[in-house]
Amino acid sequence: MTLTLMTRFLAVSNQPQAPIFIKPVPENYFLADALQHGIQTKQLNESLSTQNIGLVEEESSVCSQPISKVGFMKTHKTASSTVQNILMRYGMNSDWNFVMYSAGSHLGPPSNQYTLNRPFSSSWLRDVPWHDMAQEQGYNILAFHTKWDQGEVERVLGDGAKYITILRDPVDEFESLYNYVHFEKTFQMDLEQFVSDYIGARRPIQRVNRYLGRNQQLWDLGMVQEDINNHQAVMMKIKQMDQDFDLVMIAEDFESSLVLLSDVLCWPLANMTSLKLNARKKSAIEKLSQKSQKILKDWLWADYKLYEYFKKELEHKKNISGLQRVRKDVVELKKLNDKVKDECVLEVVKNTKTLSSDFVPWSKDVLAFKIDESKDTCKYFGISENHFIEHLRELQMERLKKWRLNL
Protein backbone atom coordinates (compact mmCIF):
# COMPACT_ATOMS: atom_id res chain seq x y z
CA MET A 1 0.00 0.00 0.00
CA THR A 2 1.44 3.37 -1.01
CA LEU A 3 0.93 6.29 1.35
CA THR A 4 1.49 9.98 0.75
CA LEU A 5 3.78 12.07 2.89
CA MET A 6 2.57 12.76 6.42
CA THR A 7 2.33 16.25 7.90
CA ARG A 8 5.82 17.29 8.86
CA PHE A 9 7.33 20.24 10.69
CA LEU A 10 10.87 21.53 10.55
CA ALA A 11 12.42 23.70 13.24
CA VAL A 12 15.53 25.86 13.18
CA SER A 13 17.63 26.75 16.22
CA ASN A 14 21.06 27.95 17.20
CA GLN A 15 21.21 26.12 20.54
CA PRO A 16 21.53 22.31 19.95
CA GLN A 17 20.37 20.03 22.73
CA ALA A 18 18.70 16.62 22.32
CA PRO A 19 16.86 15.43 19.18
CA ILE A 20 13.14 16.21 19.11
CA PHE A 21 10.11 15.55 17.05
CA ILE A 22 6.87 17.40 17.52
CA LYS A 23 3.21 16.62 18.00
CA PRO A 24 0.58 19.37 17.60
CA VAL A 25 0.09 20.05 21.34
CA PRO A 26 2.48 20.52 23.01
CA GLU A 27 4.77 21.57 20.19
CA ASN A 28 8.09 20.37 21.63
CA TYR A 29 9.14 16.90 22.68
CA PHE A 30 12.63 15.52 22.92
CA LEU A 31 13.06 12.64 20.48
CA ALA A 32 14.03 10.45 23.42
CA ASP A 33 10.78 11.25 25.24
CA ALA A 34 8.76 10.87 22.08
CA LEU A 35 10.13 7.41 21.43
CA GLN A 36 9.74 6.34 25.06
CA HIS A 37 6.09 7.37 25.15
CA GLY A 38 5.26 5.94 21.74
CA ILE A 39 4.11 9.19 20.13
CA GLN A 40 2.75 8.20 16.72
CA THR A 41 3.43 11.19 14.48
CA LYS A 42 5.50 11.93 11.45
CA GLN A 43 6.05 15.53 12.56
CA LEU A 44 9.67 16.06 13.41
CA ASN A 45 12.18 18.73 14.19
CA GLU A 46 15.22 19.42 12.04
CA SER A 47 17.16 21.02 14.93
CA LEU A 48 18.09 19.81 18.38
CA SER A 49 16.54 22.72 20.31
CA THR A 50 13.29 23.45 22.09
CA GLN A 51 13.68 27.19 21.58
CA ASN A 52 13.12 29.61 18.71
CA ILE A 53 10.84 27.19 16.89
CA GLY A 54 9.71 28.09 13.37
CA LEU A 55 7.19 25.76 11.75
CA VAL A 56 6.58 24.97 8.09
CA GLU A 57 3.64 22.73 7.22
CA GLU A 58 3.69 20.37 4.24
CA GLU A 59 1.07 18.11 2.66
CA SER A 60 -0.99 15.84 4.89
CA SER A 61 -1.28 12.06 4.75
CA VAL A 62 -4.05 9.50 4.41
CA CYS A 63 -2.15 7.30 6.85
CA SER A 64 -4.73 6.22 9.43
CA GLN A 65 -2.98 4.36 12.25
CA PRO A 66 0.39 2.71 12.84
CA ILE A 67 0.81 -0.98 12.13
CA SER A 68 1.17 -3.00 15.32
CA LYS A 69 2.05 -6.42 13.87
CA VAL A 70 5.22 -7.03 11.86
CA GLY A 71 6.80 -10.14 10.40
CA PHE A 72 10.44 -9.42 9.53
CA MET A 73 12.41 -12.08 7.70
CA LYS A 74 15.93 -11.41 8.99
CA THR A 75 18.24 -12.52 6.19
CA HIS A 76 21.98 -13.02 6.76
CA LYS A 77 24.52 -10.26 6.06
CA THR A 78 22.13 -7.84 4.37
CA ALA A 79 21.98 -4.91 6.84
CA SER A 80 19.18 -6.85 8.54
CA SER A 81 20.58 -6.18 12.02
CA THR A 82 20.05 -2.46 11.54
CA VAL A 83 16.46 -3.03 10.41
CA GLN A 84 15.93 -5.38 13.33
CA ASN A 85 17.21 -2.72 15.73
CA ILE A 86 14.74 -0.19 14.31
CA LEU A 87 11.87 -2.63 14.80
CA MET A 88 12.97 -3.70 18.27
CA ARG A 89 13.25 -0.11 19.49
CA TYR A 90 9.74 0.63 18.28
CA GLY A 91 8.41 -2.60 19.78
CA MET A 92 10.13 -1.97 23.10
CA ASN A 93 8.60 1.51 23.38
CA SER A 94 5.18 0.14 22.44
CA ASP A 95 5.21 -2.80 24.91
CA TRP A 96 4.97 -5.32 22.11
CA ASN A 97 4.99 -9.07 22.59
CA PHE A 98 7.96 -10.57 20.74
CA VAL A 99 8.10 -14.03 19.21
CA MET A 100 11.09 -15.47 21.09
CA TYR A 101 12.26 -18.34 23.22
CA SER A 102 13.09 -18.09 26.92
CA ALA A 103 16.77 -17.87 25.93
CA GLY A 104 18.81 -17.18 22.80
CA SER A 105 18.44 -14.95 19.76
CA HIS A 106 17.31 -17.31 16.95
CA LEU A 107 14.12 -19.17 16.05
CA GLY A 108 15.33 -22.52 14.82
CA PRO A 109 14.09 -25.83 16.24
CA PRO A 110 13.92 -25.65 20.07
CA SER A 111 16.40 -28.52 20.35
CA ASN A 112 19.00 -26.33 18.59
CA GLN A 113 17.65 -22.88 17.77
CA TYR A 114 20.85 -21.80 16.01
CA THR A 115 20.71 -24.49 13.32
CA LEU A 116 18.31 -22.98 10.80
CA ASN A 117 17.83 -26.05 8.62
CA ARG A 118 14.09 -26.48 9.18
CA PRO A 119 11.32 -23.98 8.39
CA PHE A 120 9.82 -22.12 11.34
CA SER A 121 6.89 -23.84 13.04
CA SER A 122 4.32 -22.23 15.32
CA SER A 123 4.43 -25.41 17.42
CA TRP A 124 7.91 -24.44 18.61
CA LEU A 125 6.35 -21.74 20.80
CA ARG A 126 4.15 -24.05 22.87
CA ASP A 127 6.61 -24.27 25.76
CA VAL A 128 7.64 -20.62 26.06
CA PRO A 129 6.72 -19.15 29.47
CA TRP A 130 4.45 -16.46 27.97
CA HIS A 131 2.51 -18.85 25.73
CA ASP A 132 -0.83 -18.35 27.50
CA MET A 133 -0.42 -14.58 27.62
CA ALA A 134 0.37 -14.52 23.90
CA GLN A 135 -2.65 -16.71 23.20
CA GLU A 136 -4.83 -14.05 24.82
CA GLN A 137 -3.04 -10.87 23.73
CA GLY A 138 -1.38 -12.02 20.52
CA TYR A 139 2.17 -11.56 19.32
CA ASN A 140 3.17 -8.27 17.71
CA ILE A 141 6.43 -9.08 16.00
CA LEU A 142 8.71 -11.81 14.73
CA ALA A 143 12.13 -10.33 13.95
CA PHE A 144 14.80 -12.93 14.75
CA HIS A 145 16.81 -15.18 12.44
CA THR A 146 14.74 -18.15 11.32
CA LYS A 147 14.11 -20.22 8.21
CA TRP A 148 10.94 -18.63 6.90
CA ASP A 149 7.56 -20.28 6.55
CA GLN A 150 4.93 -17.71 5.61
CA GLY A 151 1.94 -19.79 6.67
CA GLU A 152 3.40 -20.62 10.07
CA VAL A 153 4.39 -17.02 10.76
CA GLU A 154 0.88 -15.88 9.78
CA ARG A 155 -0.50 -18.47 12.19
CA VAL A 156 1.50 -16.82 15.00
CA LEU A 157 0.93 -13.14 14.15
CA GLY A 158 -2.68 -13.36 13.01
CA ASP A 159 -4.57 -10.82 10.92
CA GLY A 160 -3.35 -7.32 10.18
CA ALA A 161 0.39 -8.00 10.06
CA LYS A 162 2.76 -6.50 7.52
CA TYR A 163 5.60 -8.63 6.15
CA ILE A 164 9.00 -7.28 5.22
CA THR A 165 12.51 -8.49 4.44
CA ILE A 166 15.76 -7.15 3.00
CA LEU A 167 18.07 -8.41 0.24
CA ARG A 168 21.62 -7.59 -0.81
CA ASP A 169 23.74 -8.07 -3.93
CA PRO A 170 24.51 -11.82 -3.64
CA VAL A 171 28.25 -11.57 -4.34
CA ASP A 172 28.70 -8.96 -1.62
CA GLU A 173 26.42 -10.90 0.69
CA PHE A 174 28.39 -14.12 0.22
CA GLU A 175 31.74 -12.38 0.70
CA SER A 176 30.42 -10.87 3.92
CA LEU A 177 29.04 -14.21 5.10
CA TYR A 178 32.25 -16.09 4.24
CA ASN A 179 34.47 -13.71 6.18
CA TYR A 180 32.10 -12.75 9.01
CA VAL A 181 31.44 -16.38 9.97
CA HIS A 182 35.05 -17.30 9.12
CA PHE A 183 34.48 -19.97 6.51
CA GLU A 184 38.22 -19.75 5.87
CA LYS A 185 38.64 -21.85 9.02
CA THR A 186 36.21 -24.44 7.67
CA PHE A 187 37.72 -24.67 4.18
CA GLN A 188 41.29 -23.72 5.16
CA MET A 189 41.50 -21.00 2.50
CA ASP A 190 40.39 -17.44 1.79
CA LEU A 191 37.41 -16.70 -0.44
CA GLU A 192 39.48 -15.99 -3.55
CA GLN A 193 41.02 -19.45 -3.36
CA PHE A 194 37.66 -21.01 -2.44
CA VAL A 195 36.12 -19.60 -5.62
CA SER A 196 38.93 -21.17 -7.67
CA ASP A 197 39.39 -24.49 -5.88
CA TYR A 198 35.77 -25.29 -5.05
CA ILE A 199 33.36 -23.32 -7.22
CA GLY A 200 35.55 -23.15 -10.32
CA ALA A 201 36.46 -26.83 -9.99
CA ARG A 202 32.78 -27.75 -9.39
CA ARG A 203 33.58 -29.58 -6.18
CA PRO A 204 30.59 -30.49 -3.99
CA ILE A 205 30.08 -28.04 -1.13
CA GLN A 206 28.04 -28.80 1.97
CA ARG A 207 26.31 -26.06 3.93
CA VAL A 208 28.33 -24.95 6.93
CA ASN A 209 26.51 -25.90 10.14
CA ARG A 210 23.83 -27.36 7.84
CA TYR A 211 22.33 -23.98 6.98
CA LEU A 212 24.97 -21.47 5.78
CA GLY A 213 26.24 -21.28 2.22
CA ARG A 214 25.21 -20.92 -1.41
CA ASN A 215 22.16 -18.78 -2.28
CA GLN A 216 21.76 -17.98 1.40
CA GLN A 217 18.96 -15.48 0.88
CA LEU A 218 16.61 -17.97 -0.78
CA TRP A 219 17.54 -20.53 1.86
CA ASP A 220 16.66 -18.07 4.63
CA LEU A 221 13.37 -17.37 2.88
CA GLY A 222 12.38 -21.02 3.19
CA MET A 223 13.58 -22.86 0.09
CA VAL A 224 15.24 -26.27 0.33
CA GLN A 225 18.43 -27.01 -1.59
CA GLU A 226 16.77 -29.16 -4.26
CA ASP A 227 14.36 -26.36 -5.15
CA ILE A 228 17.07 -23.69 -5.11
CA ASN A 229 18.77 -25.64 -7.91
CA ASN A 230 15.54 -25.65 -9.95
CA HIS A 231 14.93 -22.58 -12.13
CA GLN A 232 11.15 -23.04 -12.24
CA ALA A 233 10.94 -23.49 -8.46
CA VAL A 234 13.00 -20.33 -7.93
CA MET A 235 10.71 -18.28 -10.18
CA MET A 236 7.64 -19.66 -8.39
CA LYS A 237 9.18 -18.70 -5.05
CA ILE A 238 9.82 -15.15 -6.26
CA LYS A 239 6.23 -14.88 -7.46
CA GLN A 240 4.93 -16.15 -4.12
CA MET A 241 7.14 -13.71 -2.21
CA ASP A 242 5.76 -10.85 -4.26
CA GLN A 243 2.33 -11.79 -2.92
CA ASP A 244 3.40 -12.49 0.67
CA PHE A 245 5.65 -9.52 1.44
CA ASP A 246 4.45 -5.95 1.70
CA LEU A 247 7.98 -4.63 1.19
CA VAL A 248 11.27 -6.20 0.13
CA MET A 249 14.02 -3.73 0.96
CA ILE A 250 17.35 -3.51 -0.84
CA ALA A 251 20.53 -2.97 1.18
CA GLU A 252 22.19 -0.94 -1.57
CA ASP A 253 19.25 1.50 -1.47
CA PHE A 254 18.86 1.42 2.28
CA GLU A 255 17.51 4.90 3.05
CA SER A 256 14.91 4.74 0.27
CA SER A 257 13.86 1.34 1.59
CA LEU A 258 13.36 2.82 5.05
CA VAL A 259 11.29 5.69 3.67
CA LEU A 260 8.99 3.13 2.05
CA LEU A 261 9.01 1.09 5.26
CA SER A 262 7.81 4.20 7.08
CA ASP A 263 4.91 4.33 4.63
CA VAL A 264 4.07 0.62 4.84
CA LEU A 265 4.06 0.59 8.64
CA CYS A 266 2.54 4.07 8.97
CA TRP A 267 5.31 5.00 11.40
CA PRO A 268 7.00 8.40 11.73
CA LEU A 269 10.13 8.83 9.67
CA ALA A 270 11.85 9.64 12.97
CA ASN A 271 11.33 6.02 13.97
CA MET A 272 13.45 4.90 11.00
CA THR A 273 16.60 6.45 12.45
CA SER A 274 19.52 4.13 13.12
CA LEU A 275 23.23 3.57 13.43
CA LYS A 276 24.94 1.23 10.97
CA LEU A 277 25.27 -1.95 13.03
CA ASN A 278 27.66 -4.86 12.42
CA ALA A 279 29.57 -2.94 9.74
CA ARG A 280 32.89 -4.69 9.25
CA LYS A 281 36.26 -3.05 9.60
CA LYS A 282 37.97 -2.43 6.27
CA SER A 283 40.63 -4.95 7.23
CA ALA A 284 37.94 -7.66 7.47
CA ILE A 285 36.58 -7.11 3.94
CA GLU A 286 38.10 -9.25 1.19
CA LYS A 287 38.44 -7.61 -2.23
CA LEU A 288 37.81 -10.20 -4.93
CA SER A 289 39.21 -10.20 -8.44
CA GLN A 290 36.79 -9.50 -11.28
CA LYS A 291 37.17 -13.10 -12.44
CA SER A 292 36.16 -14.44 -9.03
CA GLN A 293 33.24 -12.03 -8.83
CA LYS A 294 31.98 -13.31 -12.20
CA ILE A 295 32.32 -16.95 -11.10
CA LEU A 296 30.51 -16.18 -7.85
CA LYS A 297 27.72 -14.35 -9.64
CA ASP A 298 27.10 -17.32 -11.93
CA TRP A 299 27.23 -19.71 -8.98
CA LEU A 300 24.72 -17.58 -7.05
CA TRP A 301 22.35 -17.32 -10.01
CA ALA A 302 19.25 -18.16 -7.94
CA ASP A 303 19.84 -15.41 -5.39
CA TYR A 304 20.51 -13.05 -8.30
CA LYS A 305 17.11 -13.85 -9.83
CA LEU A 306 15.58 -12.96 -6.48
CA TYR A 307 17.66 -9.84 -5.97
CA GLU A 308 17.21 -8.38 -9.45
CA TYR A 309 13.45 -8.91 -9.37
CA PHE A 310 12.94 -7.09 -6.09
CA LYS A 311 15.47 -4.42 -6.94
CA LYS A 312 13.20 -3.51 -9.87
CA GLU A 313 10.15 -3.79 -7.63
CA LEU A 314 11.66 -1.31 -5.19
CA GLU A 315 12.21 1.18 -8.00
CA HIS A 316 8.60 0.64 -9.06
CA LYS A 317 7.36 1.31 -5.52
CA LYS A 318 9.47 4.47 -5.31
CA ASN A 319 7.96 5.76 -8.55
CA ILE A 320 4.42 5.00 -7.40
CA SER A 321 5.07 6.65 -4.04
CA GLY A 322 6.55 9.71 -5.73
CA LEU A 323 10.25 9.68 -6.57
CA GLN A 324 10.80 13.31 -5.60
CA ARG A 325 9.05 12.80 -2.28
CA VAL A 326 11.13 9.68 -1.55
CA ARG A 327 14.34 11.54 -2.38
CA LYS A 328 13.31 14.40 -0.12
CA ASP A 329 12.60 12.02 2.73
CA VAL A 330 15.94 10.27 2.17
CA VAL A 331 17.70 13.60 2.67
CA GLU A 332 15.66 14.21 5.79
CA LEU A 333 16.36 10.73 7.17
CA LYS A 334 20.10 11.18 6.66
CA LYS A 335 19.92 14.44 8.61
CA LEU A 336 18.06 12.71 11.41
CA ASN A 337 20.65 9.92 11.47
CA ASP A 338 23.42 12.49 11.65
CA LYS A 339 21.70 14.05 14.66
CA VAL A 340 21.42 10.67 16.37
CA LYS A 341 25.11 10.05 15.75
CA ASP A 342 26.07 13.52 16.98
CA GLU A 343 23.94 13.20 20.10
CA CYS A 344 24.54 9.56 20.98
CA VAL A 345 27.91 8.40 19.65
CA LEU A 346 30.98 9.43 21.58
CA GLU A 347 33.30 7.36 19.42
CA VAL A 348 33.32 4.69 16.70
CA VAL A 349 35.72 2.07 18.01
CA LYS A 350 37.70 -0.81 16.54
CA ASN A 351 38.98 -2.08 19.88
CA THR A 352 35.91 -3.24 21.79
CA LYS A 353 37.90 -3.72 25.00
CA THR A 354 37.14 -0.07 25.77
CA LEU A 355 33.37 -0.69 25.71
CA SER A 356 31.00 -1.76 28.45
CA SER A 357 29.70 -5.29 27.90
CA ASP A 358 26.27 -4.21 26.59
CA PHE A 359 27.87 -2.66 23.52
CA VAL A 360 30.38 -5.33 22.53
CA PRO A 361 29.24 -6.93 19.23
CA TRP A 362 29.32 -10.66 18.56
CA SER A 363 32.22 -10.40 16.11
CA LYS A 364 35.59 -8.76 16.71
CA ASP A 365 35.68 -7.87 13.00
CA VAL A 366 32.96 -5.22 13.15
CA LEU A 367 32.97 -1.60 14.23
CA ALA A 368 31.19 -0.71 17.44
CA PHE A 369 29.90 2.47 19.04
CA LYS A 370 30.83 4.07 22.33
CA ILE A 371 27.44 5.44 23.31
CA ASP A 372 26.60 8.33 25.61
CA GLU A 373 24.91 6.24 28.29
CA SER A 374 23.71 9.32 30.17
CA LYS A 375 20.89 9.51 27.60
CA ASP A 376 18.54 6.56 28.03
CA THR A 377 17.25 6.42 24.46
CA CYS A 378 20.75 6.54 22.98
CA LYS A 379 21.61 3.20 24.54
CA TYR A 380 19.30 1.22 22.30
CA PHE A 381 20.71 2.63 19.09
CA GLY A 382 24.09 1.04 19.81
CA ILE A 383 23.45 -1.86 22.17
CA SER A 384 24.56 -5.27 20.91
CA GLU A 385 21.85 -7.45 19.40
CA ASN A 386 22.10 -10.18 22.04
CA HIS A 387 21.94 -7.73 24.95
CA PHE A 388 18.98 -5.93 23.39
CA ILE A 389 17.12 -9.22 22.95
CA GLU A 390 17.84 -10.14 26.56
CA HIS A 391 16.41 -6.78 27.67
CA LEU A 392 13.28 -7.39 25.58
CA ARG A 393 12.95 -10.80 27.18
CA GLU A 394 13.13 -9.24 30.66
CA LEU A 395 10.41 -6.75 29.70
CA GLN A 396 8.27 -9.60 28.36
CA MET A 397 8.68 -11.50 31.63
CA GLU A 398 7.57 -8.37 33.52
CA ARG A 399 4.46 -8.14 31.34
CA LEU A 400 3.83 -11.82 32.02
CA LYS A 401 3.97 -11.29 35.79
CA LYS A 402 1.48 -8.41 35.57
CA TRP A 403 -0.79 -10.48 33.31
CA ARG A 404 -0.81 -13.36 35.79
CA LEU A 405 -1.69 -11.01 38.65
CA ASN A 406 -4.77 -9.89 36.73
CA LEU A 407 -6.08 -13.40 36.06
Locate the predicted segments by residue.
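Membrane-interface amphipathic segments in extracytoplasmic regions
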Residues: 1-407
